[in-house]
């Protein structure tokens, strides 16, 4: 094929004219079509006409596309669902029939033992929607369907009857209902439900706290001694641990419970173990007075740690206890631990756990003083405060089910009067009734124990001079009833759950009225009535004013002999630092002062 030359490729004037003319004709045709579709304004320029024609084409394409989509949708619809063939009355009837069929299906599933959570539209006020709590700490709580169906009046009656006050800073969770029956607990394992078989219903603190704890919220529980606080935090703890993957179990503490005394730590441990074993969880109790080696070995595989603040802090400092993965932290009897001067140890322990927002922190206390409030504001995130009883402020108040009797006697007559009381309440059908006798000092407890034993009574003792093995043996003998009389110092006055204590005798009044309230709290537990008799002497007159206030607050009689000592209430003295103690934040550093 011959090559084309430049002359061949160049257009002559005629060819160029034909090409331009053809372009103009095509442009005129497009303009004519656009005029037929939409007549442009008389003053429009050629450029405006071209733009308008493009917009018209786009609009026509859009309308055609919408029409095709509508036709395709109408072809897919069945005749019964055609809008043109269904009147308003027919539509309402269809919706009603669908609701009825859905209810019947759910009822059949329930009979077969299946469970399905669905949202059914309801127009009546009888049904309450299932509320789901906010998620925190990786846990989720869904309210039981039967609990949601209860009328609100029944829930309000339960809260009012049991004097339950719930303060939630997050209004979104205020609708969580108390678990007034064990059936409403989200626990399907029969082994985990076994500890509740001897109880009719949860205690008020358990019923009110469980939904918030199961939802992963931080909770402050203010309730009197013997109200079931241990199981209140134990059940959510075990459920949280059970929800963890298997590869995260038995590889170090994921939950920690801090208690003020060895006895209380052991008591909490015994309750938690009952639930933990059913879920294959390891639990260890860490306290002082025994060798550390066995505790250190157990900590390596323990899932739940129950400990006293002193021993746990020692193990942390030695690098033997790692709480960096403990996302469930419980401070039991927080007010008592602060009174004993454990605030610094508590702060160090919590600082070794995950940060705020990554852990769930619980605080249970019998009172709500300023020191406990400051601690809660430091280590808790939007906590829900649950107060049980007619004392929502958490001020010091004795159990209203305990009958309090105060006898003013001469100091030299105390032992004689003590023997009269033991003979009165340890005779006949009351021979095996448990009586708890409190003394102020360890030497006094040893002397009173020997005096009672010489008079022929079965008695045991528990105080700081005894070894841990001796204290445990005495406590077990008293719980079993083999030794019906127990002489103790204030080491046993707080938190110990000793069932069926009929009588508490204060042979010597304690140093503070707070200790008095916790002493007598060993009786009248678990909803039962109790009796407390106090031998008051002139040596105790400094506490007369505070004692009178406690008696009046509980509607108990105040003897005239006690009123003679006066009603003045002295400033509370700190257990460790005396009356001139100043409560300061020990975590803050001092300001450096320079002199010119």
Swiss-Prot record:
GO terms for biological process: rRNA processing. A motif (Q motif) lies at residues 180-207. Residues 1-87, 115-139 are annotated as: Disordered. It is an enzyme of class 3 (hydrolase). Keywords: ATP-binding, Coiled coil, Helicase, Hydrolase, Nucleotide-binding, Nucleus, Ribosome biogenesis, RNA-binding, rRNA processing. It comes from the Eukaryota. Residues 47-120 form a coiled coil. Residues 21-30 have a biased composition (Basic residues). It is found in: Nucleus, Nucleolus. One of its GO terms (cellular component) is nucleolus. The Q motif is unique to and characteristic of the DEAD box family of RNA helicases and controls ATP binding and hydrolysis. ATP-dependent RNA helicase required for 60S ribosomal subunit synthesis. Involved in efficient pre-rRNA processing, predominantly at site A3, which is necessary for the normal formation of 25S and 5.8S rRNAs. This is ATP-dependent RNA helicase dbp3. It comes from Sclerotinia sclerotiorum (strain ATCC 18683 / 1980 / Ss-1).
